[in-house]
């Protein structure tokens, strides 16, 4: 669609040239003596009178959160007009306040006290960021969520959303300075709040024409920016900014103690993917010990043979087990102790005791949880899934999970159940199709199948066959997908047999995109994607988040499985402690193996040099909290209980950090066996 342009006469006016009608903005400023208006405008004149915006046209249908003005939309749901969300911009008389925050200010039409909660590092202003002309520390805007709940004013930290806020502020100031009528187009009515004019001077016609054309240009720019996909390019600005902020935070954290240095190194090497255009991080990360050089012809030949062998066979796929149910499928897929019913009734809750479920199901927690979730959602009937075939697949899937302390089928069951609860958020219940829900729960169930108990970096450093096969890129995640779909090729396991070819392709694409998002090195990118999407909608004044495109939906689904994979610190403290003990034991076993192979021991993997309490506080502060904070903003008022539990768990570990570095409790061989 060609861009709209102003008329030739008004373009001449805008340029300040042509005939006697030329009237540039410098002339306008001089003619209106704006400095006098700024100096003499009273508080009442510069205050904001809030009015509700016009509803957006029903381009897509919408889902309403009970008690909230926040909606997510998809083509499958019904449309509801949005509630009031008012927009306030700083007047020229309050420029100092605006400059201090770095942008526009949107506020809900109603205000009430909010429960104070600690904010993550993303909201901390930095002098370093202020000095960079391309980065703005913070702007402020209202939540896209409920007025009744008093979600209050939120800081805008992603660059794309700050750009929208700044342009909306410019638009509002233009209307106030020129005193022209706002656009009658309902799409633009929510971009500026009505307020008393700065003056009552009748401007020359050419000035009015110029102002109208400028307003039209701004509206066109905002139209394009507000509809742009925030999934990648613009969110990469936020990702780069968040990396810089996290590096700065972790450099301070590292200075606090020796254990702080190790925790910081671990967080950087695990949760931050490496960008070639990024400056080197402030914390010196130990150089990984590399394997033998691959420059020689003999070595290249060996690697080529290994790669060929790996490509010819998907490792880890063992002989499939025959069905054990004889056609009759028990209530939970397999025979379980009667007491399991109490725990299975809590599958809709955040944090059922999955360890107890595993015990009462005779070590079939993944089968009983996944089977029950799909049955509860009526997906057996929707997709004509044969229950016996599904159980056969799930039992073989469990069989292909290794006996690791952490990355085992109990963890997979926990992630699948967490996905189910996240999908139950009122804002999401009508957004995703049944096929997308099926794929999401399946992705949670298979996301770590045949995990060896070692990290991607270890596999790369040790020249593991999988690293060679997948070219060091998301090595484990690609392997999990290969094994999961290889199992589906057996006719006894293909519970998707009644799906159409198109449905199978869609299912496979969703699962692949989701499981690849469980690569922890993608954390900052996933956080930036989600944060940018949420904040862009706030600034745009839209209380409707459109999810009618695949990229928008998969962005939310990828965030969900990443949330579920990092959900341990948000669960009841007893479960959190058990998961923490398990992951630490797995890390230590990797450290033992690295020591045996002569590799440098990875951060947090030296069993004789780990401060558990401080590592968990750092993990929550810099990884888990910012992610869940952003998610809670998206699904508000849902997930507030999750944030509260996360805060309680943080305080539990914080209170147990030894005060003196020299008396810090470190884990030793004796501690391991206590």
Swiss-Prot record:
Residues 1-82 are annotated as: Disordered. It is an enzyme of class 3 (hydrolase). Its EC number is 3.1.4.53. Residues 66-78 have a biased composition (Polar residues). Residues 39-62 have a biased composition (Low complexity). A divalent metal cation 2 binds at residue 448. One of its GO terms (cellular component) is synapse. It comes from the Eukaryota. Keywords: cAMP, Hydrolase, Metal-binding. It holds the Pfam family PDEase_I. Residues 15-24 have a biased composition (Gly residues). The active site is at 407 (proton donor). GO terms for biological process: adenylate cyclase-inhibiting G protein-coupled receptor signaling pathway; cAMP catabolic process; cAMP-mediated signaling; negative regulation of adenylate cyclase-activating G protein-coupled receptor signaling pathway; negative regulation of locomotion; sleep. Residues 328-660 form the PDEase domain. Expressed in dorsal D (DD) motor neurons and several other neurons at the L1 stage. Expression in DD neurons decreases gradually beginning in the late L1 stage. Highly expressed in adult ventral D (VD) motor neurons, but diminished in adult DD motor neurons. It catalyses: 3',5'-cyclic AMP + H2O = AMP + H(+). Its cofactor is a divalent metal cation. SUPFAM superfamilies: HD-domain/PDEase-like (SSF109604). Hydrolyzes the second messenger 3',5'-cyclic AMP (cAMP), which is a key regulator of many important physiological processes. Antagonizes dorsal D (DD) motor neuron respecification by reducing levels of cAMP. This is Probable 3',5'-cyclic-AMP phosphodiesterase pde-4. The gene is pde-4.
């Amino acid at each position: 669609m060609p861009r709209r342009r102003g008329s030739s006469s008004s373009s001449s006016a805008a340029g300040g040239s042509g005939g006697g009608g030329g009237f540039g903005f410098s002339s306008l400023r001089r003619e209106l003596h704006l400095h006098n208006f700024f100096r003499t405008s009273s508080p009442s004149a510069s205050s904001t009178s809030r009015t509700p915006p016009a509803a957006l046209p029903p381009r897509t249908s919408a889902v309403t959160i009970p008690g909230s003005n926040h909606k997510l939309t998809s083509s499958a749901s019904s449309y509801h007009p949005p509630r009031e969300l008012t927009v306030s911009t700083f007047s020229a008389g309050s420029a100092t306040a605006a400059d201090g925050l770095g942008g526009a200010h949107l506020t809900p039409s109603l205000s009430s006290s909010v429960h104070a909660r600690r904010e993550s590092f993303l909201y901390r202003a930095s002098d370093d960021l202020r000095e960079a002309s391309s980065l703005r520390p913070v702007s402020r805007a209202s939540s896209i969520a409920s007025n009744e709940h008093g979600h209050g004013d939120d800081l805008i930290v992603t660059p794309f959303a700050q750009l929208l806020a700044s342009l909306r502020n410019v638009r509002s100031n233009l209307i106030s300075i020129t005193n022209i009528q706002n656009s009658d187009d309902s799409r633009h009515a929510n971009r500026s709040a009505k307020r008393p004019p700065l003056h009552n001077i009748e401007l020359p016609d050419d000035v009015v024409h110029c102002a109208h054309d400028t307003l039209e240009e701004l509206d066109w720019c905002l139209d394009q920016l507000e509809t742009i996909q925030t999934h990648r390019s613009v969110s990469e600005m936020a990702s780069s900014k968040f990396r810089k902020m996290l590096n700065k935070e972790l450099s301070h954290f590292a200075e606090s103690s020796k254990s702080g240095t190790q925790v910081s190194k671990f967080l950087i090497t695990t949760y931050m993917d490496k960008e070639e255009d990024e400056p080197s991080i402030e914390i010196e990360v130990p150089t990984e010990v590399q394997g033998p050089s691959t420059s020689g012809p003999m070595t290249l030949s060996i690697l080529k043979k290994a790669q060929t062998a790996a490509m010819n066979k998907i490792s880890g796929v063992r002989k499939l087990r025959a069905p054990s149910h004889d056609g009759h499928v028990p209530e939970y897929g397999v025979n379980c102790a009667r007491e399991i019913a109490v725990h299975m009734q809590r599958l809709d809750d955040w944090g059922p005791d999955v360890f107890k479920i595993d015990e009462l199901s005779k070590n079939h927690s993944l089968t009983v949880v996944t089977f029950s979730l799909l049955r509860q959602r009526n997906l057996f009937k929707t997709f004509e899934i044969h229950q016996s075939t599904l159980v056969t697949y799930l039992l073989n899937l469990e069989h292909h999970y290794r006996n690791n302390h952490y990355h085992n089928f109990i963890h997979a069951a926990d992630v699948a159940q967490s996905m189910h609860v996240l999908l139950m958020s009122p804002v999401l219940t009508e957004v995703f199709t049944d096929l997308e829900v099926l794929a999401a729960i399946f992705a949670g169930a298979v996301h770590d199948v045949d995990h060896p108990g070692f990290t991607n970096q270890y596999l790369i450093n040790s020249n593991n066959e999988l690293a060679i096969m997948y070219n060091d890129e998301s090595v484990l995640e690609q392997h999990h997908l290969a094994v999961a779909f290889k199992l589906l090729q057996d006719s006894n396991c293909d519970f998707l047999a009644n799906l159409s070819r198109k449905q199978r392709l869609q299912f496979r694409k969703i699962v692949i995109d989701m499981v690849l998002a469980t690569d922890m090195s993608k954390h900052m990118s996933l956080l930036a994607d989600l944060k940018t999407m949420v904040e862009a909608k706030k600034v745009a004044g839209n209380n409707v988040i459109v999810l009618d495109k695949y990229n928008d939906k998969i962005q939310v689904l990828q965030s969900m499985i990443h949330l579920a994979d990092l959900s341990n610190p948000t669960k009841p403290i007893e479960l959190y402690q058990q998961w923490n003990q398990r992951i630490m034991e797995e890390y230590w076993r990797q450290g033992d193996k690295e020591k045996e192979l002569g590799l440098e021991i990875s951060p947090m993997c030296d069993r004789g040099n780990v401060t558990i309490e401080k590592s968990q506080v750092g993990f929550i502060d810099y990884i888990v909290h910012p992610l869940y904070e952003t998610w809670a903003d998206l699904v508000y008022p849902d997930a507030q209980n999750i944030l509260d539990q996360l805060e309680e768990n943080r305080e539990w570990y914080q209170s147990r950090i030894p005060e003196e570095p020299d008396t810090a409790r470190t884990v030793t061989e004796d501690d391991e066996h206590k």
